[in-house]
Amino acid sequence: MKFEPILPEATINTVTRAELIGAFSYALDITEGQPAGHCLHACWIGSHIGRALGLSPQDREDLYYTLLLKDLGCSSNAARICELYEADDRAFKQGYKTVGTGLAATIHFIASRTAKAASFPRRVGVIGHILKNGDKIAQELIVARCTRGADIARTLQFPDAVSNGIYHLDEHWDGSGRPDHLRGDAIPLASRIALLAQVADVFHTHAGRNAAIDELKRRSANWLDPVLVKAFESVATDEQFWIGLKSPFLEQRVLALAPTENAREVDDDYLDDIAGAFGKVIDAKSHFTAGHSARVADLAGRIGASMGILPSRRRWLYRAALLHDIGKLGVSNSVLDKPGPLNEREWVIMREHAAHTQAILGRVGVLADMAPIAAAHHERIDGSGYPLGLKDDQIRRETRIITVCDYFDALSSDRPYRGAMSRSETLAIIESNVGTAIDGDCYEALRLNL
């Protein structure tokens, strides 16, 4: 996964909230198993509908961020999907979005995707449980996703219109949606547009322009607001709309649609908020990693101070530590939460998370220095680490700090294949890796800062 930075000359004083949120939306795409740029596509589609409807500048701004952040809570139900359906959560989510609205299509999808690796009796039992408890399961999964997404949006200081837009993404026009079974105009307009934009992009990506239009028509007046479907049909007559949707410069085109009346430049405090918010998205992927990013960042900050790193640079270290595992959003929970050793294929998938971290954080120039620090936390002093096999002085001091903090927290926390180790056991293991995986000075700083 490789993306070119869109702001090579950006500084903390010139980057806007729209630019940063647009870049981080790629992390949400990979969590949902969607192609890179899905949230940007949805923003392009939905923003054009908003303009066609003549929305006010404030309503267009709220819609814009609802579209980019519609999947902000998506990591919170990944582990549960994997557990319930005994399936790759990312592949399951991706496939489910292309399923028709009828009950027969849903049953066929569940039967074909659930517990595929299990024995026949086990598979029948799992499928039977899901079909018997389908309504309860669907409510649980969507409430988790919507509640988490809305909560994180509030921590990013977005207004209620945005958090409510995210919360009600899965409501349907006919009242059959979730989490609150709202009907018609009771559903926030931003939610109605976001759902339409999501369906349009998924089917356009999957099967082309005509398939997207046909699917929206099929879902009109059941899933989707018929007025919005008509608005989309009008927008879709403009060939430039489709050219823009497929443009390799879609990031810049979507950025140009961002309302400028209340454009917010990002200062250091807000960048901290964004890093903290996406740290929560990362940690929600698995209950085994709950709080991991925040603990690693806190410990890295203390060690950085004790090792004489200047406060301004230490702030970047803290952000890098918060986001070091953002690439794990692109790894299935069937791998992350496996209760036994990973096989060779699974190790390849797991190791890819470091490259994903580099790709996501490297999209924006203001994060360019931080990206390799975060992405290299599995490199080893002896050169046997990944993703690049760096060694010795090729590994920056900030990365070495994150590495030892990550190692400490991983060993001292519960994992799917073992329980948490005691502090003495953890330190003994880390000490045994000094000089091969772990920097000796960083180990001593860790020991003194616990």
Please annotate each region the language model reported:
Residues 3-450:
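Metal-dependent catalytic cores of enzymes that make or break cyclic nucleotides
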